[in-house]
UniProtKB/Swiss-Prot annotation:
InterPro entries: Bact_transf. It is found in: Cell membrane. It is a single-pass membrane protein. The nature of the anionic polymer present in the cell wall of B.subtilis depends on phosphate availability. Under phosphate-replete growth conditions teichoic acids are present, whereas under phosphate-depleted conditions, at least part of the wall teichoic acid is replaced with teichuronic acid, a non-phosphate containing anionic polymer. The synthesis of teichuronic acid is accompanied by degradation of teichoic acid and reutilization of liberated phosphate for other cellular processes such as nucleic acid synthesis. Induction: By phosphate starvation, via the PhoP/PhoR two-component regulatory system. One of its GO terms (molecular function) is glycosyltransferase activity. Its main location: membrane. Belongs to the bacterial sugar transferase family. Pfam families: Bac_transf. It comes from Bacillus subtilis (strain 168). This is Putative undecaprenyl-phosphate N-acetylgalactosaminyl 1-phosphate transferase. Coiled coil: none annotated. The chain crosses the membrane at residues 39-59. Pathway: Cell wall biogenesis; teichuronic acid biosynthesis.
Length: 179
């Protein structure tokens, strides 16, 4: 009998209908709870991470001249740009020729930088971005404007994953957009 029910259900709904949703289905309560949790986890994370951020900031400044905290423009929710914070893992002039992704054994990456990238310690200052509301603990990774523009031309639905208001995006398309 359960096989008959599943057959009926599969005839009544298309896969696209089952795997799609609209942002308006998320309630204000859900978004408020998510924001409170972001603030809570960011505060706890910063309490734990600040000593590490301080130590690695000193090590970065001792190894190479320049600021320890690196800021980079990213595209956030609704396509709004913001400054993302990271511990600097590359030499100061690393992107003088333009925006490129780091490669394996990239000569622009410092010795301390290689370690903090491998251990993801370079990402700890992003807890300040979460606290400010620029980004969330859970959600799509904010990308650089140059790459966002490139991906929106190559990957259908890429910018919709940023939650720019009312939208419809299938789960499988959202997964591809995050890749």
């Amino acid at each position: 009998m359960s096989a008959e029910k599943s057959m009926n259900v599969s005839r009544e709904f298309s896969v696209q209908q089952i795997h799609s949703f609209t942002l308006s289905e998320k309630t204000a309560r859900y978004l408020a709870i998510k924001r409170v949790m972001d603030i809570w986890f960011a505060l706890i994370g910063l309490a734990i991470a600040l000593p590490m951020i301080a130590v690695f900031s000193i090590l970065i400044c001792l190894e190479t001249p320049g600021p320890a905290i690196y800021t980079q423009e990213r595209v956030g929710k609704g396509g709004k740009p913001f400054k993302l914070y990271k511990l600097r893992s590359m030499k100061i002039d690393a992107e003088k020729s333009g925006a490129v992704w780091a490669q394996k054994q990239d000569p622009r990456v410092t010795r301390i930088g290689a370690f903090i990238r491998r251990t993801r310690i370079d990402e700890l200052p992003q807890l300040f971005n979460v606290l400010k509301g620029d980004m969330s603990m859970i959600g799509p990774r904010p990308e650089r404007p140059v790459f966002t523009e490139k991906f929106q031309n190559e990957i259908p639905g890429f910018t919709q994953r940023l939650g720019s208001g009312e939208r419809r995006l299938r789960y499988d398309a959202e997964g591809k957009a995050d890749i």
